[in-house]
Structure formats: structure tokens, C-alpha cells
Amino acid sequence: MSEKKINLLDLDRKAMRALFADLGEKPFRADQLMKWIYHFGVSDFEEMTNINKVLRQKLAARCEIVAPEISSYQKSTDGTIKFAIHVGEGQEVETVYIPEDDRATLCVSSQVGCALECTFCSTAQQGFNRNLTVSEIVGQIWRVSHFLGFAKDTGERPITNVVMMGMGEPLLNLANVIPAMDIMLDDFGFSLSKRRVTLSTSGVVPALDKLGDALDVALAVSIHAPNDELRDILVPVNKKYPLQEFLAGIRRYIAKSNANRGRVTVEYVMLDHINDSTEQAHELAQLMKDTPCKVNLIPFNPYPGSPYGRSSNSRIDRFSKVLMEYGLTVIVRKTRGDDIDAACGQLAGDIRDRTKRLAKKRMQENQISVTMN
């Protein structure tokens, strides 16, 4: 039985150099290889013309460069493109490309499904199967870059920003997310600025501390409620890591960080008559008074079976004005790609749920139906 080949997309520069040392090669050869992969999109060793033939043969014998395939894609009327990425066993994750005048952002997934159970998120309703590997995370960027055209072909960088805001909780897959983000930031990788790579978390505090020790990227935090009582319902991980504990972890992270310029982005989904009153706006402003931040208000994007509705523009406007009275910077996120279910909270993919969450939910619904009848 032949030995399984090493997928080079799984290796950050440190691991790549270790592999080359094992091959008896100097570190700069690893850097050359990374440039071929991430700057030029090359996956065939024979095309790497500044690497000698003997080394190319060694690499071909032991290694491969394999990214997950794009199964399908949909393009929104606003230019947003949602990609279904096949990750094996009939499963797909979703990745979203969001073009703007001054940037091109890719929203990347970190898990097949999500282990958290936020009640307003479509991904959470699908259950959870597994963590994505490093190659499956960076492979999303690599594949979409191929789809759009690498800079060598177009003269322009196809993706300028990456946000870890797709399917999954990135901090629950830290072992793979950290090397994946290392590759995003590496000059020999995708060469993105640390201010242009953003990780979004619902608040797994111990992992946030580990991230702060390992990497400096922009941080976005999913708050969504001004108090623990409501957040326990909307974001159940709050029962384990309540708001004050989460906020303390956020302050520790931004104290170490240059990428965040001294403040964090607070994400707050606007749910009609759930978390959008002026009283709750005052409460949120008070909650955040010791944590430097800007607030991103996200109009809720409904999905089939969702128990919530989107806040009206007038309620969002009133909420925003209250926050600004406290001196907070407030941005109301423009909804992108909702016509193809690519907007915030709408990503679902195709998942084999190992948590049996959907089955349990249907059983509970059936029991309620029987009781009512």
C-alpha cells in the first residue's frame, strides 16, 4: 500500500521548511514553492521552472497540491458570488465573494456546519460534522482565486480581504485556523495585510486567549444581545462564557494587537422586537463602555423556518442614533447576496449532522404537535 501523499496546502511556511529540510533542501526552496502555489496558482510541479528537475521529482513522489473543488456557484444581482465547495463524503461548505469598489472580500468557512447553536443562524440549524483542514480553509481562497483569475493573469489581486465569517466557529478549530491564517498573511502565501484578515467569534474565551498569543488579525465579536439573559437564548455559548468574561477576553486580545488599532468590531444582528428597542440600545452602550469598539448593526437575513423577523429600518435607525449619542461609531451593514441566500446568517451548505440536532428538533416539533392535537 502506497504512502499517503502530503498535501502542501496543509503546510504553513514553518512546516513547509521542515519538509524541505527532511528532503535535504535549503529553506529558500520552500519559499519558492509557496510563491508558485499562492502567487501564481500553480499545482503542477513541472511548471515550477526555477526548481530543479530532481527536486521536482522528489516533490511529485511525496507531495501533492490539492484544493477542494467548486461544486457550483450562484451570482447575485449585486455582484456577490456564493460558491458551494465540496469537502468529501457528499458534503459542501459555502464561501462568499463580495466585490466592492475599493476591495474584494472572501467570506471563508472553518467548519462543516457549526457546533454552536445560535438561534438566528441558518448554519447552526444544519448541525455539525467536523472541522475543516488547513488545505480546505486556504483551498477556498485558492479555488476562488482560480475562478476569478490570479494576479499574474489579470494584473489585479483577486481577493484583498478575507473574513472568517462563513460556516462554523473559527475558535473551535484553532489548530487548523491558525496555520491557515498564517498562510493568508505570509509574504510567500496570499500576502494579505493583518488588518485585512478578520476572524469573527461568538466567544470561546480560552481559545481567544490562545489566538492572541499566536497571531495578530482583526477581530469581530458576535455580541447580538445587551445582557446575559437574552444572549443565553440567542447565543447559547454565553452560558459557558458570559458577556463580562467574553469582554475581558476581548480587551486582552486588543491590548496585544496592532491589527485592531485599539478597538474591536462588535457585530449585532437586528431582530425585530427581540433585541432592537431603544432601551436595549442604551443597555448595549453601557455594556461596551469599557471596551473600545465600533458597532456593526446587521439587518437580520431570514431563512426558511427562521423564528425571527428583520428589524424595520426605523427601529434600526433609532437604535443606531442611541449608540451614537454615547460616542460610538456605528455602521449599518449593507445586505449583500440575500437573493441567493449568501447574506450574513444564511449560509447552510450540505452537511451530515453528527450532532443529530435536526433529528432532535423534528422529534420535539412532532411531540408538540401531538400534544396540541
From Swiss-Prot:
GO BP terms, alphabetized: rRNA base methylation; tRNA methylation
Disulfide bonding pattern of the chain: C107-C344
Catalytically driven reaction(s): adenosine(2503) in 23S rRNA + 2 reduced [2Fe-2S]-[ferredoxin] + 2 S-adenosyl-L-methionine = 2-methyladenosine(2503) in 23S rRNA + 5'-deoxyadenosine + L-methionine + 2 oxidized [2Fe-2S]-[ferredoxin] + S-adenosyl-L-homocysteine; adenosine(37) in tRNA + 2 reduced [2Fe-2S]-[ferredoxin] + 2 S-adenosyl-L-methionine = 2-methyladenosine(37) in tRNA + 5'-deoxyadenosine + L-methionine + 2 oxidized [2Fe-2S]-[ferredoxin] + S-adenosyl-L-homocysteine
Keyword Calcium: no
GO MF entries: 4 iron, 4 sulfur cluster binding; metal ion binding; rRNA (adenine(2503)-C2-)-methyltransferase activity; rRNA binding; tRNA (adenine(37)-C2)-methyltransferase activity; tRNA binding
SUPFAM superfamilies attached to this UniProt entry: Radical SAM enzymes
GO annotation, cellular component aspect: cytoplasm
Primary role: Specifically methylates position 2 of adenine 2503 in 23S rRNA and position 2 of adenine 37 in tRNAs. m2A2503 modification seems to play a crucial role in the proofreading step occurring at the peptidyl transferase center and thus would serve to optimize ribosomal fidelity.
This protein's name: Dual-specificity RNA methyltransferase RlmN
